[in-house]
């Protein structure tokens, strides 16, 4: 669908391992897991119109990401914001949104 060449190509995020049709084991990329989950979501709609899909998916990924980052930085918001590549004020808003303040 789209080609996203970023610095993460060398170290893609994985969520586990999957067995291919020929029996080899390969890493399951987070990107593929999200794609599969969104496809399953649409398949289960049974003709209903989807609403706010972007926000739904973003919340499903962003909340656990923030939780892990905050644990990793032992609650240091400045370090967490730097690791995420966002402004500390933006991080504070996101933490508040998910009740992590």
Swiss-Prot record:
DNA-binding region: 77-96
Residue ranges of the TM segments: none
InterPro entries reported in the protein's UniProt record: Fis_DNA-bd, Homeodomain-like_sf, HTH_Fis, Trans_regulatory_Fis
Domain of life of the source: Bacteria
Keywords: Activator, DNA-binding, Transcription, Transcription regulation
GO MF entry, a single one: DNA-binding transcription factor activity
Known function: Activates ribosomal RNA transcription. Plays a direct role in upstream activation of rRNA promoters.
Family, as annotated: Belongs to the transcriptional regulatory Fis family.
UniProt name for this protein: DNA-binding protein Fis
Gene source species: Shewanella amazonensis (strain ATCC BAA-1098 / SB2B)
Gene that encodes the chain: fis
């Amino acid at each position: 669908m789209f080609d996203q060449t970023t610095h993460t190509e060398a170290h893609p995020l994985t969520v586990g391992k999957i067995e291919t049709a020929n029996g080899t084991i390969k890493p399951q990329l987070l990107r593929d897991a999200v794609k599969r989950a969104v496809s399953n979501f649409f398949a289960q709609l049974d003709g209903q119109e989807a609403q706010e899909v972007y926000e739904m998916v973003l919340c499903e990924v962003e909340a656990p990401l923030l939780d892990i980052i905050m644990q990793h930085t032992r609650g240091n918001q400045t370090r967490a914001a730097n690791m995420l590549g966002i402004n500390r004020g933006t991080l504070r808003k996101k933490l508040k949104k998910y009740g992590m303040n």
